[in-house]
Amino acid sequence: MRNIVLAILLFTCVSLAAQDNGWKLTATDADAAYVGAPVANGGIGILPWKEPFSVRHVILNHVFENGGKHGVSRVLRGINPFLLSLKVDDVAVEGKNIAGWRQEIDMKAAAHITSFDALNKVKVRYSIRALRNMPYAGMIQVEIKALENCAVQVLQRTEVPKEYGVPDTVYTKMKGGQAGQYVVSVSAPSRYGTHKVTGSAGFVYEKKAFDFRLLKEAGAISISRTLQKGETVKFALLGTVC
């Protein structure tokens, strides 16, 4: 009887593990044919891609642009504030200088997860989510581990699709935040003036974990830090599009 109970428990554990694995889809070949899988929350959809930190599009749900006098209305692409880039010792991290690339779609956690080693100096892991309880918001959580002593810089910029009018950029200092922390907001009218869309973003990190810089000429914000071998640092980028 005891053996039967143990066998049932073992079968149950194996079944639960199999069910959990069924929630996840994994890719490890960055050179294979690729189709992005979006994360969405009913308000916005975010489309990650295979290149490091790449986000191809942000789509606004049920927001349509007038097609003009003789055109057809279509879903409006959103302003994209989720663009990040990483430099290690002043060298840009790109697809050609990374190894161990892996992407995972965790359907249970509603997360798109990417990991890789870059320049033999850092191990990077980041996840992209469209926040469930904030319908116009998304978040990118990033973890960087130093494989050797190095300096890292992360740059955030905002992309305005070409079908928009002239953009306007505003930098707002965060109340109650750390000295020098800002949120960057970019607003622009849609082509035919049907909507005015704003994309905003800001970094979130532990106090004194990074040096923050406001790059108005480049229309961007950045954080940087020197890491010692074996040291791990984490931060997040929060963004909204509405």
Where does each model-flagged region fall?
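Beta-sandwich/jelly-roll carbohydrate-recognition scaffolds of carbohydrate-active enzymes
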Residues: Q19-C242
